[in-house]
Protein backbone atom coordinates (compact mmCIF):
# COMPACT_ATOMS: atom_id res chain seq x y z
CA UNK A 1 0.00 0.00 0.00
CA UNK A 2 1.37 3.41 -0.98
CA UNK A 3 2.46 5.63 1.91
CA UNK A 4 1.42 8.72 -0.02
CA UNK A 5 -1.55 10.04 -1.95
CA UNK A 6 -1.66 12.26 -5.00
CA UNK A 7 -4.30 14.96 -5.12
CA UNK A 8 -4.96 18.28 -6.80
CA UNK A 9 -3.30 21.39 -5.41
CA UNK A 10 -5.17 23.46 -2.81
CA UNK A 11 -4.44 27.02 -1.70
CA UNK A 12 -3.30 25.85 1.72
CA UNK A 13 -0.44 23.98 0.01
CA UNK A 14 1.17 27.09 -1.46
CA UNK A 15 4.01 27.69 1.01
CA UNK A 16 4.98 24.01 1.13
CA UNK A 17 4.83 23.75 -2.67
CA UNK A 18 6.99 26.83 -3.18
CA UNK A 19 9.54 25.65 -0.61
CA UNK A 20 9.74 22.20 -2.22
CA UNK A 21 10.03 23.68 -5.70
CA UNK A 22 12.79 26.13 -4.70
CA UNK A 23 14.88 23.60 -2.78
CA UNK A 24 14.42 21.00 -5.52
CA UNK A 25 15.82 23.33 -8.16
CA UNK A 26 18.68 24.74 -6.09
CA UNK A 27 19.88 21.30 -5.01
CA UNK A 28 21.24 20.84 -8.54
CA UNK A 29 23.80 23.65 -8.13
CA UNK A 30 26.65 21.44 -6.76
CA UNK A 31 26.13 18.97 -9.64
CA UNK A 32 26.14 21.87 -12.10
CA UNK A 33 29.46 23.08 -10.66
CA UNK A 34 31.02 19.62 -11.03
CA UNK A 35 29.65 19.35 -14.57
CA UNK A 36 31.15 22.73 -15.47
CA UNK A 37 34.53 21.83 -13.98
CA UNK A 38 34.81 18.76 -16.21
CA UNK A 39 34.07 20.57 -19.47
CA UNK A 40 37.13 20.57 -21.78
CA UNK A 41 36.98 24.36 -22.21
CA UNK A 42 36.91 24.81 -18.42
CA UNK A 43 39.87 22.50 -17.85
CA UNK A 44 41.81 24.27 -20.58
CA UNK A 45 41.07 27.68 -19.08
CA UNK A 46 41.97 26.57 -15.54
CA UNK A 47 45.30 25.33 -16.89
CA UNK A 48 46.08 28.20 -19.25
CA UNK A 49 45.22 31.15 -17.01
CA UNK A 50 47.55 30.27 -14.09
CA UNK A 51 50.28 29.18 -16.51
CA UNK A 52 50.09 32.55 -18.24
CA UNK A 53 50.42 34.30 -14.88
CA UNK A 54 53.47 32.21 -13.94
CA UNK A 55 55.15 32.90 -17.28
CA UNK A 56 54.37 36.61 -17.05
CA UNK A 57 55.15 37.22 -13.37
CA UNK A 58 57.10 34.20 -12.19
CA UNK A 59 54.82 33.98 -9.15
CA UNK A 60 53.33 30.61 -8.29
CA UNK A 61 51.48 32.17 -5.36
CA UNK A 62 49.68 34.52 -7.73
CA UNK A 63 48.80 31.54 -9.93
CA UNK A 64 47.30 29.67 -6.95
CA UNK A 65 45.28 32.74 -5.98
CA UNK A 66 44.10 32.97 -9.59
CA UNK A 67 42.88 29.35 -9.56
CA UNK A 68 41.07 29.95 -6.26
CA UNK A 69 39.19 32.96 -7.59
CA UNK A 70 38.41 31.22 -10.88
CA UNK A 71 36.84 28.34 -8.96
CA UNK A 72 34.76 30.78 -6.92
CA UNK A 73 33.64 32.47 -10.13
CA UNK A 74 32.69 29.15 -11.73
CA UNK A 75 30.75 28.14 -8.61
CA UNK A 76 28.83 31.41 -8.79
CA UNK A 77 28.14 31.10 -12.52
CA UNK A 78 27.03 27.46 -12.21
CA UNK A 79 24.35 28.47 -9.74
CA UNK A 80 22.98 31.42 -11.69
CA UNK A 81 20.64 29.57 -14.13
CA UNK A 82 18.95 27.75 -11.26
CA UNK A 83 18.61 30.82 -9.04
CA UNK A 84 17.29 32.89 -11.94
CA UNK A 85 14.77 30.20 -12.85
CA UNK A 86 13.44 30.01 -9.29
CA UNK A 87 13.17 33.80 -9.06
CA UNK A 88 11.34 33.98 -12.41
CA UNK A 89 8.85 31.24 -11.50
CA UNK A 90 8.11 32.73 -8.09
CA UNK A 91 7.14 35.96 -9.83
CA UNK A 92 5.09 34.29 -12.56
CA UNK A 93 3.31 30.92 -12.56
CA UNK A 94 4.20 29.87 -9.00
CA UNK A 95 2.96 33.16 -7.55
CA UNK A 96 -0.65 32.14 -8.19
CA UNK A 97 -0.82 28.43 -8.92
CA UNK A 98 -4.60 28.30 -9.08
CA UNK A 99 -4.71 31.01 -11.73
CA UNK A 100 -1.70 29.73 -13.67
CA UNK A 101 -2.70 26.07 -13.82
CA UNK A 102 -6.12 25.14 -12.46
CA UNK A 103 -7.87 28.03 -14.20
CA UNK A 104 -5.89 27.67 -17.44
CA UNK A 105 -7.05 24.23 -18.65
CA UNK A 106 -4.13 22.59 -16.91
CA UNK A 107 -3.64 21.11 -13.46
CA UNK A 108 -1.25 20.99 -10.52
CA UNK A 109 -0.88 17.96 -8.26
CA UNK A 110 0.83 17.33 -4.96
CA UNK A 111 1.95 14.09 -3.38
CA UNK A 112 1.12 14.06 0.32
CA UNK A 113 2.59 11.79 2.98
CA UNK A 114 1.99 12.08 6.70
CA UNK A 115 0.11 15.32 6.15
CA UNK A 116 3.10 16.90 4.38
CA UNK A 117 3.57 17.85 0.73
CA UNK A 118 6.45 15.68 -0.49
CA UNK A 119 6.09 15.93 -4.27
CA UNK A 120 4.71 18.20 -6.97
CA UNK A 121 4.03 18.21 -10.70
CA UNK A 122 2.10 20.49 -13.04
CA UNK A 123 0.80 20.49 -16.61
CA UNK A 124 -0.42 23.07 -19.11
CA UNK A 125 -1.60 22.89 -22.72
CA UNK A 126 1.03 23.86 -25.30
CA UNK A 127 -0.25 27.04 -26.92
CA UNK A 128 1.33 26.44 -30.32
CA UNK A 129 1.18 22.70 -30.89
CA UNK A 130 2.23 21.31 -34.29
CA UNK A 131 -0.56 20.93 -36.81
CA UNK A 132 -2.78 17.97 -36.01
CA UNK A 133 -1.37 17.55 -32.51
CA UNK A 134 -2.79 18.48 -29.11
CA UNK A 135 0.11 18.68 -26.69
CA UNK A 136 0.34 18.95 -22.92
CA UNK A 137 3.55 20.15 -21.25
CA UNK A 138 4.76 18.77 -17.93
CA UNK A 139 6.32 21.23 -15.47
CA UNK A 140 7.95 21.33 -12.04
CA UNK A 141 8.33 17.64 -11.21
CA UNK A 142 9.98 17.53 -7.80
CA UNK A 143 10.09 15.13 -4.84
CA UNK A 144 11.41 15.84 -1.36
CA UNK A 145 14.91 14.42 -0.87
CA UNK A 146 13.66 12.59 2.24
CA UNK A 147 10.98 10.70 0.32
CA UNK A 148 12.79 9.52 -2.78
CA UNK A 149 12.99 5.88 -3.76
CA UNK A 150 9.30 5.27 -3.04
CA UNK A 151 8.06 5.67 -6.62
CA UNK A 152 6.54 9.10 -5.98
CA UNK A 153 8.11 10.77 -9.02
CA UNK A 154 6.94 7.97 -11.30
CA UNK A 155 3.44 8.16 -9.82
CA UNK A 156 3.33 11.92 -10.42
CA UNK A 157 4.36 11.46 -14.05
CA UNK A 158 1.71 8.76 -14.45
CA UNK A 159 -0.85 11.23 -13.10
CA UNK A 160 0.08 13.72 -15.82
CA UNK A 161 -0.06 11.03 -18.50
CA UNK A 162 -3.49 9.87 -17.36
CA UNK A 163 -4.75 13.46 -17.29
CA UNK A 164 -3.47 13.90 -20.85
CA UNK A 165 -5.25 10.74 -22.03
CA UNK A 166 -8.49 11.72 -20.33
CA UNK A 167 -8.40 15.19 -21.91
CA UNK A 168 -7.68 13.88 -25.40
CA UNK A 169 -4.09 15.05 -25.78
CA UNK A 170 -1.88 13.38 -28.38
CA UNK A 171 1.49 14.10 -26.74
CA UNK A 172 3.09 15.05 -23.46
CA UNK A 173 6.23 17.17 -23.78
CA UNK A 174 8.74 18.56 -21.31
CA UNK A 175 12.18 20.08 -20.93
CA UNK A 176 14.83 19.33 -18.33
CA UNK A 177 18.39 20.54 -17.91
CA UNK A 178 21.46 18.51 -18.86
CA UNK A 179 22.37 18.51 -15.16
CA UNK A 180 19.29 16.52 -14.10
CA UNK A 181 20.46 13.05 -15.07
CA UNK A 182 18.10 11.31 -12.65
CA UNK A 183 15.09 13.02 -14.18
CA UNK A 184 16.20 12.10 -17.70
CA UNK A 185 16.60 8.46 -16.71
CA UNK A 186 13.10 8.47 -15.22
CA UNK A 187 11.48 10.02 -18.29
CA UNK A 188 13.17 7.61 -20.67
CA UNK A 189 12.15 4.64 -18.50
CA UNK A 190 8.54 5.81 -18.81
CA UNK A 191 8.58 5.95 -22.59
CA UNK A 192 9.66 9.53 -23.25
CA UNK A 193 12.08 10.13 -26.11
CA UNK A 194 14.63 12.89 -26.53
CA UNK A 195 13.68 15.29 -29.29
CA UNK A 196 16.43 17.91 -29.20
CA UNK A 197 18.43 20.51 -27.32
CA UNK A 198 17.40 24.02 -26.39
CA UNK A 199 20.47 26.26 -26.38
CA UNK A 200 19.51 29.60 -24.88
CA UNK A 201 21.16 32.82 -25.99
CA UNK A 202 23.08 33.45 -22.78
CA UNK A 203 26.82 33.98 -22.32
CA UNK A 204 26.73 32.57 -18.80
CA UNK A 205 24.93 29.40 -19.89
CA UNK A 206 27.38 28.97 -22.76
CA UNK A 207 30.34 29.34 -20.40
CA UNK A 208 29.06 26.67 -18.04
CA UNK A 209 27.76 24.39 -20.81
CA UNK A 210 24.16 24.64 -19.63
CA UNK A 211 21.29 23.68 -21.91
CA UNK A 212 17.88 22.02 -21.85
CA UNK A 213 16.92 18.68 -23.38
CA UNK A 214 13.41 18.26 -24.80
CA UNK A 215 11.40 15.06 -24.35
CA UNK A 216 8.05 13.86 -25.61
CA UNK A 217 5.83 10.82 -25.51
CA UNK A 218 3.01 10.12 -27.95
CA UNK A 219 -0.16 8.19 -27.19
CA UNK A 220 -1.22 5.42 -27.26
CA UNK A 221 2.37 4.31 -26.56
CA UNK A 222 3.62 4.78 -23.06
CA UNK A 223 5.60 2.36 -20.90
CA UNK A 224 5.93 2.27 -17.16
CA UNK A 225 2.23 3.05 -16.55
UniProtKB/Swiss-Prot annotation:
It is a multi-pass membrane protein. The keyword Transmembrane helix applies. Residues 69-213 form the N-acetyltransferase domain. InterPro entries: Acyl_CoA_acyltransferase, GNAT_dom, NAT_camello-type. The chain crosses the membrane at residues 29-49, 53-73, 202-222. Keywords: Acyltransferase, Developmental protein, Gastrulation, Membrane, Transferase, Transmembrane, Transmembrane helix. It is found in: Membrane. GO terms for cellular component: membrane. May play a role in regulation of gastrulation. GO terms for molecular function: N-acetyltransferase activity. The gene is Nat8f5. This is Probable N-acetyltransferase family 8 member 5. One of its GO terms (biological process) is gastrulation with mouth forming second. Belongs to the camello family. Pfam families: Acetyltransf_1 (PF00583). Gene3D superfamilies: 3.40.630.30. Its main location: membrane. It comes from Rattus norvegicus. Its EC number is 2.3.1.-.
Amino acid sequence: MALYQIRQYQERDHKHVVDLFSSGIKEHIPAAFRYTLLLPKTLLFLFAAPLTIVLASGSWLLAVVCIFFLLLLLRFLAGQPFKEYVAMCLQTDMADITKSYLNSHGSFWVAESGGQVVGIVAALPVKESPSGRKQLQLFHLSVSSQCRGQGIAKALVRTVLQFARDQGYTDVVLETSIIQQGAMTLYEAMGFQRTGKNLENSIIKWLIGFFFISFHVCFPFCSGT
